[in-house]
């Protein structure tokens, strides 16, 4: 399979596997979290453990302990401030972030006008990724796409144009190195190109008009943004103006973490659980 068109396909594959991933749900006191967990449980791809401790720090630490003891495969944020949960994930009893790993946010979107799911990073965690961090992002996104059934993901390194500009945008020189490393198979089976702008990443017609040749061919599966501002604006624009359906998780930790906002819908939290469940068990 080379594409995943929508979240329903993700859920269908999970149902076929008939494996329930154990989810530690921290402070499940909001309606959308409860409904998403109930729906995912009824669909048969998660088994939820609700951590209801009124002491939020203790609740977060309990979730971390469950992962460390092998009794939870995933963590989900409920009605708890992100900073409390992240502090436990990063620090409690050694935390869940292996040495040398990068904590990064990734999202997956089903945009009505777009023919397949689109993955992107980072819209919430890393303000200005370093070159080394971006290399890890490429690896994480490759692994995630493989877990989602995309054999050879096409990964676009996003910029405002297709020109390398070391003076004003030094990260574009790093893009060139990442592309070369991908060609030599460093990230596994994937295709990486950049710099590309958003349109040439996702539109073959735009590539044709600009006269640009790219192995991605205007058919990107993954967008890697240069900074959090670009990623966050894209994240909010597609929901506000395009009615996109979203999933959001954290990568880099020992297990997937569903870290949605309190304002996110039941659907977003349900789809996030589905993506996390698809990834669970494949972490390196």
Locations of regions flagged by a protein language model:
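Anion-binding alpha/beta catalytic cores of soluble intermediary-metabolism enzymes, centered on
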Residues: 1-216, 221-284
């Amino acid at each position: 399979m080379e594409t995943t068109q929508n979240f329903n396909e993700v859920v269908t594959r999970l149902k076929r596997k008939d494996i329930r991933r154990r989810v530690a749900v921290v402070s499940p006191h909001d309606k959308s979290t409860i409904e998403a967990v109930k729906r995912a449980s009824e669909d048969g791809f998660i088994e939820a453990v609700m951590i209801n401790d009124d002491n939020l720090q203790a609740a977060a630490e309990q979730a971390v302990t469950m992962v460390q003891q092998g009794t939870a495969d995933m963590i989900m944020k409920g009605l708890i401030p992100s900073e409390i949960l992240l502090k436990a994930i990063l620090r409690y009893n050694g935390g869940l972030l292996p040495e040398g790993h990068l904590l990064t946010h990734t999202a997956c979107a089903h945009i009505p006008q777009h023919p397949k799911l689109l993955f992107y990073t980072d819209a919430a965690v890393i303000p200005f990724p370093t070159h080394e961090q971006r290399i890890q992002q490429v690896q994480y996104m490759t692994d995630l796409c493989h877990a989602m059934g995309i054999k050879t993901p096409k990964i676009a390194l996003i910029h405002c144009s297709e020109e390398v500009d070391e003076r004003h945008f030094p990260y574009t020189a790093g893009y060139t190195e990442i592309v070369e490393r991908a060609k030599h198979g460093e990230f596994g089976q994937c295709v990486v190109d950049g710099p590309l702008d958003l349109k040439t990443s996702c539109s073959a017609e735009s590539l044709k008009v600009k006269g640009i040749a790219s192995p991605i061919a205007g058919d990107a599966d993954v967008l890697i943004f240069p900074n959090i501002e670009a990623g966050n604006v894209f994240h909010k624009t597609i929901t506000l103006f395009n009615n996109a359906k979203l999933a959001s998780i954290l990568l880099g930790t020992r297990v997937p973490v569903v870290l949605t906002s309190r304002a996110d819908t039941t659907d977003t939290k349900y789809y996030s659980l589905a993506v996390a469940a698809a990834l669970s068990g494949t972490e390196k």
